[in-house]
Structures are given as structure tokens and as C-alpha cells.
Amino acid sequence: MARDSALNVSVGIIAAVMICVAASQASDVFAPFALALFIIALVWPLQSWLQARMPALLALAITMTVTVAVCIAFASLVAWAFGRVGVSLLADTARYQALYQRAIDWLEDRGISVAGLWSEHFNVGWLVHWAGQITGRVNTTLSFWLIALLYVILGLMEVDDLRRRAQAYLRPETARILLQGSAATAVKIRKYMEVRTLMSVATGVLVGLFAWVAGLHFALEWGVIAFALNYIPFIGPFVATLFPTLVAMTQFESWEAAVGVFVCLNIIQFVVGSYIEPRVSGAMLAMSPTVVLLAVFLWTYLWGLFGAFIGVPIVIAIVTFCAHHPSSRWIADLLGGPVEKNDLARA
């Protein structure tokens, strides 16, 4: 019995590693497909409501129009904010270099020699260039989104057919796990995005108000950036506090002011992310912070910036499906808690 358990664990680990390798090597195929499944989970209630009242193709056209319009509006807003901030950062490269040199001189006057070490591994010009690249870079190309939207169109057309096929051709227990797991996963993903959007709006408003009260340039842009990056756990909030700090360094020409801006922004992120959000999301989306952090970094490594965004929904899906089978329920209990009865009823 113990040998069988050890064998099952070993096979599971090997399978997980192989899946990660396949996801990385075939990211051009799997990443758009993952995005499509995510979008389908979000928009299916709209599609289902519309196609009950009009022809399915007309309902699909309306759903896709709304989806594309929301994506374009969000991308345009983010590009506007990052573009304005990025131009400012690149224009102040010389001032950042001067502040950096002043910091080195201050440390050396106190017997702390770091110039030789930092000059080999760190340069403010490189840092600003890197920051400027981030502000102007979109990790997902047009072809990526076109493929994903094609998957969405085909997927929305086949949801009902796939449900009937699963019930007709799969074993009853397998069909139950697949259908209930898919429905519960979709419910949780919609809840996740609802909570994440509310918290992103709250974070953006608070950051924008703080920047305006503090007299920091680009207050509206900082609010938009904080709103957008809050969709990426851990990494996004850190970047959203780093950029305003860089601008504060040149605007106020004071390390103390820059540190103050950095601390205040992190307090906002901490209060919203660690205190308010868990109470809004409740037990339905409860997951270990370690699991969330691992998911973010793992999928960032596999799929880049898009992986940082989609990592948590992937873990939500894995935990939810594991909760619907007795042999894997312990994984759900370990990573995210047992499935809630009201979640299944709502699905």
C-alpha cells in the first residue's frame, strides 16, 4: 500500500514536470488557449442569456463585440498611462544618474565602498532603460490575441455540444467531474475577477488620490497604472510602487521624499491586498499565499507577463477540479481548502 502511494506520488510529480515543460515549449499554442478558456468562463453568462432570447450567432456577435471593446478600452487606457510615464522616465535619465552618484558619494564618505561592486552589476541608465522598455512593451502580440479570440468564438459555439457529448460518451462519474468541475471553476474565476476588479479600482483611486495630495506628477496616470497592475499578484503592485518612486526622486530631489512615497504606496497596497481583499473574497477563493506566489513566478517563468496574470486562475482551476474527486480532494484541502457546498449549488 505504501509502495503504491509512493508510486502514485512519483508519477504525479513526473507528470507535473512534463506538463510544465510542454507548456513552456508549446507556449504559442497553450497560452492563447488558456486565455480563451479564461475569457469563455467570464463571458459565458452573457452568451447564455443572449442566446436564450435570440439566434445563437447574433448572441455570439454581441458577446464578441462587447469582449473586444472591453479589451481595447483597457489596453488603450493602460498604454496611455504607461506611455506618458515612460517618456518622463527616459527624459530624466541624466538626473537619475546624478542622484545615483550622490548616493554612492554619501556612502563612501561614511566608509561604505560600493562603487566598484555596483558599477559592475548596476547602472541607473540601464535601470531607466529597462523601466522604459517595460512601460512600452506589450508581451502579447496581435497574433496571440487573434488566436485567442478565434478559440473564444469556437469555444462559445461548442459549449452546449461539448456538454451533451460528455454526458453521452463519457462514464457518468467522469462526466460529473468534468461538468461540475468546469462549472465550479467558471464560477470561481468570475468571482476572482469580480473581487480583483473591485480591489484594483480601490487601489487605483487611493494611489491617485495620494499622488494628487502629495503633489506627485502624473497623479491620474499613477492611479490607472496601479489599477491595471493590481491584476497581477505580487509583481504588479511592486512595479506600481516602483515607478512613482523613481519619478519622486527627480521631482522632489530628495531621497527622503522618495522613500516616503514608496512606503505610503506600499501601505496602500498592503491594506487593500492583505486586509480588505481576503474579507471581500471570503472562503470561496481562499488559497495559501505561498501557493499564489509560486503560481505567479512559475507561470511568469513559463509564459512571461501573461503567465503572471493567468497563473492564479490556473491554480483555481486545478484546486477546483481536485476537490471534485475523492482521490485528489486532499490536494484541494492542502492548497485551497475544501469545496464549498454553496459554490456547487451556485454552479
Where are these regions (language model features)?
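Membrane-water interface of transmembrane alpha-helices in multipass transporters/channels
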Residues: S27-L35, V213-V224, F252-G260, M287-V292, ...
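Anchoring transmembrane alpha helix of integral membrane proteins
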Residues: M1-W80, V259, I316, T320-A347
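Hydrophobic alpha-helical transmembrane segments of membrane transport and translocation systems
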Residues: A258-A347
